[in-house]
């Protein structure tokens, strides 16, 4: 599709936002160089396997039926490389950031956070006496201002 003016671009953007909102949940696996070096591709493959083998859950680019739709996606750098591999779970307005995820953690993340409303506490970032669930609450990430690549963590 060729976009030739701003109105067409705005229409494409609105369609993309509507499509993203149709997912019940998005699993975002960091594929920045640091996370790839620490094994994020294995995390991605394991999540795809788990979602693909779960009854009444489907992975599709364009949801169109009554099943629960879960998107599994590689993203650009999520900005917290020291603690990779990183996985974010987006359900509506709720975002959970998991750190140092290993393939053996994927089923627990899927069962507790994707299919339920729970957390995997040991995979959350902790500093001093604080536990951080949402990525924007983590002090290091909260101080980052991404101007050009602001949406890289989501796309």
What do the predicted segments below correspond to?
Residues 1-155:
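Feature of Fe-S/electron-transfer and energy-metabolism proteins
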């Amino acid at each position: 599709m060729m976009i030739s003016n701003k109105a067409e671009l705005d229409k494409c953007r609105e369609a993309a936002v509507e499509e993203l909102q149709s997912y019940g949940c998005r699993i975002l696996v960091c594929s920045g160089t640091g996370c790839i070096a620490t094994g994020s591709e294995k995390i991605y493959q394991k999540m795809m396997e788990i979602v693909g083998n779960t009854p009444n859950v489907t992975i599709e680019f364009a949801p169109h039926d009554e099943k629960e739709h879960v998107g599994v996606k590689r993203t650009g750098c999520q900005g917290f490389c020291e603690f990779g591999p990183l996985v974010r779970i987006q359900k509506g307005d709720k975002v959970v950031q998991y750190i140092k995820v290993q393939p053996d953690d994927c089923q627990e993340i899927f069962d507790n956070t994707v299919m339920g409303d729970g957390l995997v506490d040991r995979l959350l970032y902790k500093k001093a006496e604080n536990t951080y669930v949402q990525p924007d609450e983590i002090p290091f990430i909260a101080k980052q201002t991404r101007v050009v690549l602001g949406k890289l963590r989501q796309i």
